């Protein structure tokens, strides 16, 4: 297991609400909570940038973190991430913020401390461009957008 440096920016986190944790031994994501001042209604089509009360420093350039939606919020209530996926670089040290978007047809109340997203660590492979005049031929070539099959 890797260690992450973390700062608690909202004193309610870790006292009134649990610190991010894995729900089960097989969980990939740490739950992030809405550390709002008060319960907030997110209207249909509306987006809101929500503080998590936490900053992290990954430090290892071989790792990054992804902020991903919680499946239940999206499926049951239409609440997804406004940017679809958040990328946290290894050298970022600011507060983790979650952009929530209500793509549903009904208002949704985000409660203070509610679990709104999950943080997943992923390996990073950095690459450099090797400029070429043409590529070695592949079976697929430049085919895209449905080229490999209909379903």
UniProtKB/Swiss-Prot annotation:
Substrate binds at residues 70-72, 83, 87-89, 97. Pathway: Pyrimidine metabolism; dUMP biosynthesis; dUMP from dCTP (dUTP route): step 2/2. Its EC number is 3.6.1.23. It catalyses: dUTP + H2O = dUMP + diphosphate + H(+). It comes from the Bacteria. The keyword Metal-binding applies. Keywords: Hydrolase, Magnesium, Metal-binding, Nucleotide metabolism. It is an enzyme of class 3 (hydrolase). Transmembrane segments: none annotated. NCBIfam families: dut (TIGR00576), PRK00601.1 (NF001862). This enzyme is involved in nucleotide metabolism: it produces dUMP, the immediate precursor of thymidine nucleotides and it decreases the intracellular concentration of dUTP so that uracil cannot be incorporated into DNA. This is Deoxyuridine 5'-triphosphate nucleotidohydrolase.
């Amino acid at each position: 297991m890797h260690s992450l440096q973390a700062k608690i920016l909202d004193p309610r986190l870790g006292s009134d609400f649990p610190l991010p944790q894995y729900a089960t031994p097989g969980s990939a994501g740490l739950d992030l909570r809405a550390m709002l001042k008060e319960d907030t209604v997110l209207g249909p089509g509306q987006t809101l940038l929500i503080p998590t009360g936490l900053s992290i420093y990954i430090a290892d350039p071989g790792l990054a973190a992804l902020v991903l939606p919680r499946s239940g919020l999206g499926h049951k209530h239409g609440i997804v991430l406004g940017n679809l996926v958040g990328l946290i670089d290894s050298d970022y040290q600011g507060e983790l913020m979650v952009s929530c978007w209500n793509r549903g047809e009904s208002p949704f109340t985000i409660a203070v401390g509610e679990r709104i997203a999950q943080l997943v660590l992923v390996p990073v492979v950095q690459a450099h461009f090797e400029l070429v005049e043409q590529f070695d031929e592949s079976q697929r070539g430049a085919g895209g957008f449905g080229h490999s099959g209909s379903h």
